[in-house]
Amino acid sequence: MAAMRIYSDWNTRSSDNSEQIDPYRKYLFICEGENTEVWYFRHLIEIRKELGINPLIDIQLLERTEEDKTNSNPKKLIEYANAIIRTPSKFNFDVNRDKIVLVFDADIYQEKLESYRRILNDAKEFILAISNPCFELFLLLHV
């Protein structure tokens, strides 16, 4: 008796049998503030599933140590970010794929426009999340 159905592989690709590599990117957040910004990004990480953030995207918050708590100047944030790029294995950071996000307020640069321009120029390779005048106002307007 003839087979009722003949199965073939006409609809499979040769790449279907090879190991699949899913896209994966890590975002490292470095914040100027030590209270509000840290709370916001911790909460964002906690509710990422409810927000529909792709599970293949890793969000990490780099918190400053006790000795670094007073180093909140955006120049210091850029130094921290550059240190990550110089020693990526220490932070499990892939310089070709992962991104660093620097979060700081612009309100302290109202009178220091040239310093602000220098900071923007020094941070070109990073993603900047600048709140103007401050992060707390951003939260009030968006929550």
Regions inferred by a protein language model and the residue ranges of each:
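RecA-like P-loop NTPase motor core
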Residues: 2-87, 91
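Short glycine-/polar-rich loops that comprise or flank the Walker A/P-loop
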Residues: 24-25, 55-57, 96-99, 124-126
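Acidic beta-strand-to-loop metal/phosphate-binding motif
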Residues: 28-30, 93-109
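Acidic, metal-coordinating catalytic cores used for nucleic-acid/nucleotide bond scission
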Residues: 34, 69-72, 104-113
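A residue-level signal for conserved active-site and pocket-lining positions in enzyme catalytic cores
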Residues: 41, 102, 136
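Short loop/turn segments at strand-loop or loop-helix junctions that form parts
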Residues: 59-66, 103-106, 132-133
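Short, charge-rich binding segments
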Residues: 90-96, 118-121
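Activity-critical C-terminal alpha-helical subdomain
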Residues: 107-143
